């Protein structure tokens, strides 16, 4: 959930990092929050460079990418970098949802594609 401390920090960090990335890079934040809650959080946090998407209804993204925590109906903390041709260029599954991702590794993977 975007309202949890680690998700909050992560999305704010990527929102900040977006300024240094190519305008061809699109950053998406997926959660099982309702779209209304996502919009509220993004507005309150001043997040404009990260688009939030909701997997609340069917959790299809979580199922298809193997990041659904079934018992909690939440998504595991994971980062996917998708190349312009649609192939998966990089992935990072954070073993503990209370930990932040390795931002440097993610940004390096993104910059290699730009």
Predicted region positions:
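Chalcogenol-based redox active-site neighborhoods
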Residues: 1-114
């Amino acid at each position: 959930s975007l309202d949890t401390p680690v998700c909050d920090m992560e999305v704010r960090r990527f929102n900040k990092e977006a300024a240094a990335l190519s305008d061809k890079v699109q950053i998406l934040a997926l959660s099982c929050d309702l779209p209304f809650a996502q919009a509220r959080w993004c507005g309150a946090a001043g997040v404009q460079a990260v688009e939030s998407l909701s997997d609340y209804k069917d959790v299809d993204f979580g199922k298809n990418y193997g990041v659904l925590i079934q018992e909690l109906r939440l998504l595991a903390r994971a980062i996917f970098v998708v190349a312009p041709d649609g192939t998966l260029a990089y992935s990072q599954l954070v073993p503990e949802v209370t930990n932040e991702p390795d931002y440097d590794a993610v940004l390096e993977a993104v910059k290699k594609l730009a």
